[in-house]
């Protein structure tokens, strides 16, 4: 969600901070700010609502010069979208703080600090941290000790960076429930919430663990664990492309990432399949020791990743012969649930930092699961580090808030997991081999799906003035209908709902009229004839139908029924292939409506708060 950048250097850092914020815009935000300590040891800051460019323009009018500074993009939680609520927050013109997360006991701390004479200028929970650290520094006489004492009093999640005019070369950072990464330079060091922000200045990174506090200056980095012990954390060289944050020839990141799906899936498959099945080491060392005993799979995820899990349930139960439950992470973690014997906990997250999913993973360690596996796109993430097994999707950096290539590579990984478990559960070798061949054909099928873009762009014109829409699917295409509805509402702001087509008579049929477009994701299996009956029910009531169907399904269009013929593919990979036309439909509808495709209102890319 919010983005953090900090730097301590021998050179001026304002440009570094602004470039870092620019590279974090994809995370979603509504205001931004920068603070530096200048040559006279004065704290200077500029904050603005709106885009980073507006902040940059303001700084050009009132330059900020300093060799140490912090910066932030805010996504409002406590308090409205105002300049006063934007970060960095200050205390007594000495302490400046940026913070990601939510402090749950901020009201009590605010009252205590007000009683001590501190004056609050915002509605945020973050300003509490600034005043609390200032108060503790008066007691302890040192910034590091003050931060350690302050964070022990915080309840909730935080990733925070602090600077102090009394220590004008130091940044003190702390994380609990919100990720932070330190960038290691030569004569300079950095900190950020995402390594993408720092790729222009370093490729050497230290990923802080839960509960870590770090004291950073230009030449030294001292890290302390949650018990206060000095620790060494590994320095990792990033292989993420420097230009991963660029759009190239494409108008939007989302379109670029839709077109990248064939290569992203090809990369995800590379080196992980034999001729007859999936290699166990695709899921980590000693994966076979866990997978061979699995009798049940519990999938936990949020949003688009939850839809991927729902598709996987069909695969796992029909081919791998294991039972499977799929639950939204924010529900799973707050209820008592039954843990089946020999159960595998599977978390799915693009970032590996999704707050509720990460909390569910940590909860599972107390519940008796056989093991945990994460399907994730970020190898350095908390979920990867804290899971027993990990499948990395190799999608590359995904910048658009609406997930595209992360989703299709998650589905690819989940189908491979079905093979990985199924081969120990009696899945016939002939069936395994057929799935392998389908996966090997998948990148080419995705290229064919992307080639429908011009046809879908024309189709999108029909949706430009609609306020509502209905998506229908059956079998493993039902979750794809859900994903299509989510994409349309996310980026075009058209209200969209998805239903299993068999539920049409149980309520949704009441909504059908000539103003309600109905999008149908048609399976090419024994459910096809059932779905054709549902189509006729809608047509009989004057509904406008748009059917995405296998070109061999022989759907015939007319004035009330538009058919988009999708390339023929193996039934097992159809949910992945049919995802692409629905993504393109959402993109082109949003383009026509003039919405912010890459940064839709009120949404964030990485949801790192509850």
UniProtKB/Swiss-Prot annotation:
Keyword set includes Cytoplasm: yes
Active site: 2, 605
Record's subunit section: Homodimer.
Name of the protein in question: Glutamine--fructose-6-phosphate aminotransferase [isomerizing]
Subcellular localization(s) per the UniProt record: Cytoplasm
GO cellular component term of the entry, any: cytosol
UniProt xrefs under CDD domains: GFAT, SIS_GlmS_GlmD_1, SIS_GlmS_GlmD_2
Stated role: Catalyzes the first step in hexosamine metabolism, converting fructose-6P into glucosamine-6P using glutamine as a nitrogen source.
Coiled coil: none
EC number(s) stated in the UniProt entry for this protein: 2.6.1.16
Protein's GO biological process: carbohydrate metabolic process; fructose 6-phosphate metabolic process; protein N-linked glycosylation; UDP-N-acetylglucosamine metabolic process
Keywords: Aminotransferase, Cytoplasm, Glutamine amidotransferase, Repeat, Transferase
Top EC class, one word: transferase
